Amino acid sequence: MFWLHGTSPKASEPEAEPAAAASPASPQSPKPAEKLATGPGPVATVGELAQPWAGRRFLFKDPVTSEPVPAMVVRLPDDSYWGFSLREPFGTCELEYVSDLQKLRSDYDYRADHPMIGNPCNHSVYDLLRYGSSSNGGLVRGEVVQGAGIRPPMAIEVRVDGKEIIAVRME
């Protein structure tokens, strides 16, 4: 079974700190603010994710192919953090973190009271607050609540070290 080790920030830590400045965009790097974690490494700061549902994209090295995989870490309402791959578990589509509830209604025909993960290719919707079965029978966050999705997104273990959020490993 794969469990994520999200932790809450300490009460002594400031509520927010300025986000890191992004380097100027170049034609070769359309998303310059994304950090690449090739092993356990920082992908965001506690200050960048100071509010519930705040998210930060990053790239994580696939343990099998060594290719960079688009990923995201989100602060949940219980002050824990959840990391997940934005690559569809059994396909080629890139998942999206949908914080705009109107977009969930219009693009996915799904009504929710909090952000979800969506698959724009098959209109599957994944709930960040619910657990679903993984391919090995364990439970992972991101239950499929609508559509043809086979399993939740691949989890990325994250932990807090001081003011940094560290991506540790992919499921």
Can you describe what each PLM-predicted range is?
Residues 2-113, 125-134, 139-146, 150-171:
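N-terminal pre-ligand scaffold of iron-sulfur
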Residues 114-121:
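Cysteine-rich micro-motifs
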